[in-house]
């Protein structure tokens, strides 16, 4: 999903959100107020028009719309029994949600706001996902009780295929800018794995990308150069790794329980982070734009 001229117009209009040059490089600051979301705040995602959506606003089972000045309003309440943990948009501009309590991938019509089940398979707890240019989803599916997890691919028709059924607690997941490498982390095991991805979305050559001795791992995103940004849960930093697995820097946040992140702003150089201890969001200016810019 690339961002086009329409987004640029909207970005300029929302100066509080997009005037990124006023922010000190790598210096985190508050974006939304605290305690607007639940402690399950997660899954920040921009649509192609520059609108920001985040899960679990005010109560679990909701989607919040975050305005350019950091104010938040209710966009959608999900059907009873559903709680989203991640958001993506497909090429049809439909919102897709990882529903970890309903064990589904949900689809939202953005005009009618009608919610339907897009995929329902043997999911334990779909947690996070990323999407490629063919509208294929790659989904992490952890079992926190057993410290195990699975990796799925869901095609554009909603058909799921198990790619790896013998992983640790799968959580954060991201594709490289060229969509040839898939990164999947395991929160409890504190490992990040890399897979090669072929043109059909099959994975191979699983290898250890990096691992940590402490704290947790959560959401991940790539910048345009292929560097990987990892939310270090409980440590309160975003760890940035080069494509060859070398630590470039750690960006300190004010909150500790960082759950996910997304690139945004006029040039894609603002990074917005969800924090579960703050029940809100922070942001910082980056030197490289996100992979969609």
Positions of predicted regions on the chain:
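A short helix->beta-strand "capping" segment at the edge of beta-propeller domains
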Residues: 20-38, 70, 206-207
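Beta-rich, blade/repeat-based domains predominating
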Residues: 35-51, 79-99, 104, 121-150, ...
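Glycine/small-residue-rich hydrophobic helix-like segments
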Residues: 197-260
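Short loop/turn segments that connect beta-strands within beta-propeller blades
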Residues: 66-71, 109-113, 154-158, 196-201, ...
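A short loop-to-beta-strand structural motif that recurs across blades of beta-propeller domains
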Residues: 62-64, 104-106, 150-152, 191-193, ...
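Bacterial Sec-dependent N-terminal signal peptides
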Residues: 1-22
């Amino acid at each position: 999903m690339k961002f086009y001229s329409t987004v640029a117009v909207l970005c300029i209009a929302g100066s509080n959100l997009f005037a990124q040059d006023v922010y000190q490089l790598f210096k985190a600051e508050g974006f939304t107020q605290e305690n607007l979301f639940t402690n399950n705040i997660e899954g920040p995602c921009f649509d192609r028009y520059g609108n920001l959506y985040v899960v679990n606003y005010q109560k679990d089972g909701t989607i919040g719309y975050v305005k350019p000045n950091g104010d938040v309003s209710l966009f959608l309440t999900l059907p009873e029994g559903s709680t989203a943990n991640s958001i993506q948009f497909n090429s049809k501009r439909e919102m897709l949600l990882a529903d970890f309590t309903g064990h589904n991938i949900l689809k939202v019509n953005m005009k009618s706001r009608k919610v339907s089940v897009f995929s329902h398979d043997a999911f334990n707890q779909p947690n996070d996902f990323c999407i490629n240019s063919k509208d294929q989803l790659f989904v992490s599916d952890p079992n926190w009780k057993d410290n195990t997890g699975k990796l799925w691919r869901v095609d554009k028709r909603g058909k799921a295929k198990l790619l790896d059924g013998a992983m640790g607690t799968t959580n954060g997941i991201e594709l490289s800018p060229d969509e040839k490498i898939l990164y999947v982390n395991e929160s409890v095991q504190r490992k990040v794995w890399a897979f090669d991805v072929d043109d059909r979305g099959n994975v191979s050559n699983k290898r250890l990308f990096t691992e940590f001795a402490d704290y947790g791992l959560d959401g991940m995103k790539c910048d345009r150069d292929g560097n990987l940004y990892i939310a270090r849960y409980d440590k309160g930093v975003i760890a940035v790794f080069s494509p060859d697995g070398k630590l470039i820097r750690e960006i300190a946040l004010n909150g500790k329980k960082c759950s996910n992140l997304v690139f945004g702003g006029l040039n894609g150089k603002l990074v917005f982070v969800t924090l579960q201890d703050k029940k809100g969001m922070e942001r910082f200016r980056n030197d490289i734009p996100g992979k969609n810019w």
